[in-house]
Amino acid sequence: MIERFINYLISEKGLSKNTVESYVFDLTHFKNFLDSNNIELKKVSEEDLTGYVAYLYNSGYSPRTIMRHISTLRNFFKFLYNEEDIPVNPAEILETPKAFKMLPKYLTNDEVEKLLNLPDTTTPTGQRDKAMIELLYATGLRVSELIDLKMNNLNLEERFLITFGKGSKERLVPFSKKAYQYLVTYINDGRIKLLKDKKSYFLFLNVRGNKISRQGFWKILKAYGRKIGIEHKLSPHTLRHTFATHLLEHGADLRAVQIMLGHSDISTTQIYTHISNERLKQIYFNFHPRAKKQDDND
C-alpha cells in the first residue's frame, strides 16, 4: 500500500524528488513503529496514530519534524480511504496544529450531555445507540472492543465487563450505573426486537440482527454529532479521549487510567495529562484572586 501511494505521488501528483523522498522516509519510519508493536497497516486506529505522535515527541523529535510526519500520515490515510483499502480514515481527526500541542480532541461535559440526550429510547435502534454511547463514555473502550462485546462479556450484577484488547490481552473494566440502566433496557427490549428470530452472541446488533460494524457505528455517531454541531471532532475514539480526560480532570490516578484504557505504555496515557494541565491553568487564572488581579493589570 505504501508503494502504491508513492507511485501515486510521482505519477499523478507530480511531486519533486525531495518531497517524495520525505514521504518515503516518514512512512518507512511509521511502518517500523507498527511492526515493532505488531500492528497491521490495514488495522491502524486513531489511538495507534496518537501513540505514534507521542512516541515521536518522547523520542526528542523537533516540533517541525513531528508536524511533517502528521501531514504525511494524513495524506497517506486519506489516499487509502479514497481507494477503499480501509473502511474508516483513522487520521481524519489528526490535525497539524498551529502551535505545537499534540493533544487528542475531547468533548466538554456539556457536549457529552447533549450527545447522550439525542437517541430516541422509544425505538430499538435508539435504545442500542444510547447504550453504546453511554458505555463508550463510561468505559473508554476502543470501538473495536465495543462492537466485539458478547453477552457473556457482561457482568450486570457487579457492573463490569471483560474485553480483549490489542494482542488479545484480557482486561476487566467497570461501568457506571447509568450505563447499566441503559444496557438493561436495550438487552430486555431493543436487542430482542433487533434480533427477531435470529441468534447472536454479540451484544450490539444492526437492524438486520447481525453484529453492528465499526463503520456502521461511526456513521451513527457522526449523524448525532451533526445534530449538535460537533461532527468535526466526534468519532468513537473521541469518547475514549473524553473518558480519560474527564477522569484525570477529576483526580484519577494516571496508572489506573492506563489500566482501564488498556495501554501497554504509560507514555500513551500521559498525553491526556497535558489536556488536564491546560484545564488546571484555566481554572487557576479564572478563579484565583491574585492571578485575576495580575491578569487585569497586565
Residue ranges and their predicted role:
Residues 1-298:
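Conserved catalytic core of the tyrosine transesterase superfamily
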